[in-house]
């Protein structure tokens, strides 16, 4: 299923189907940050299912139960919050793609949304990795007005931190794509997710569908240098 991308004009008329235009080898080694749970884990499942070589950065305390159930996935131990640790992770392999779905929590704080992602971005650049897909959230950057007031009140700080990471990636010189999901749920992929450039877009989307959009964006040159909101069609 090709990515469905809505531009501001096309969004008023119809969904625009963009044919995949791979700029990377069919099997591109991918390093995933945030791959032990949520969107990251779903992304790892899809990439591994396609035969991609996937490595996930994991902490010593990470629960690897779900990852261990996926064939062909490698892990490297490190901490995204530790710059030296991230450097070692990149040195441990020859990666062509980085996907980061890092995010904090109410209990652990949200600095990983900025510092962790920035470390991943800098590590990729230093290692010569060109392709970087970053997952943040609707409400960050120019999509702030799309987020409902209760969401802004509850997640204001996390959105600020995510925007710092977005700005850093935009200025990095990498071949980047930023995907901002709306309200996340764990429904199966029974509804079509879309990528839209409308910064005013808001809606729900399953983690599994966000993962599909990520994997289909990786080699699609049309998504390079673009910021999208991800919602159900």
Locate the predicted segments by residue:
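Conserved Rossmann-fold cofactor-binding substructure of NAD(P)-dependent oxidoreductases
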Residues: 74-96
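N-terminal Rossmann NAD(P)H-binding glycine-rich loop of SDR-like oxidoreductase domains
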Residues: 30-50
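Substrate-positioning beta->alpha
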Residues: 116, 179, 201-216, 226
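NAD(P)-cofactor binding segment of oxidoreductase domains
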Residues: 96-132, 163-164
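N-terminal Rossmann-fold cofactor-binding loop
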Residues: 57-62, 80
């Amino acid at each position: 299923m090709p990515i469905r991308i809505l531009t501001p004009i096309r969004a008023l008329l119809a969904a625009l189907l963009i044919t995949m235009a791979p700029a990377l080898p069919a099997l591109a080694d991918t390093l995933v940050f945030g791959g032990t749970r949520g969107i990251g884990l779903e992304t790892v499942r899809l990439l591994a299912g396609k035969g991609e070589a996937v490595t996930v950065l994991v902490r010593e305390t990470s629960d690897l139960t779900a990852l261990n159930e996926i064939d062909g996935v490698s892990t490297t131990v490190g901490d995204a919050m530790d710059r030296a640790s991230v450097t070692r992770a990149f040195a441990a392999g020859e990666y062509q793609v980085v996907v980061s779905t890092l995010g904090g929590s109410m209990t652990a704080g949200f600095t990983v949304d900025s510092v962790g992602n920035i470390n991943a971005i800098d590590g990729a650049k230093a290692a010569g990795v060109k392709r970087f897909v970053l997952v943040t959230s609707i409400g960050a950057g120019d999509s702030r007005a799309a987020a409902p007031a209760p969401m802004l009140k509850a997640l204001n700080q996390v959105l600020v931190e995510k925007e710092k990471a977005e700005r850093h990636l935009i200025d990095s010189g990498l071949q980047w794509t930023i995907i901002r999901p709306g309200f996340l749920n764990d429904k199966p992929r029974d509804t079509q997710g879309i990528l839209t450039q409308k910064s005013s877009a808001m809606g729900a989307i399953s983690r599994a569908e966000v993962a599909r959009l990520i994997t289909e964006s990786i080699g699609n040159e049309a998504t390079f240098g673009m910021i999208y909101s991800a919602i159900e069609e």
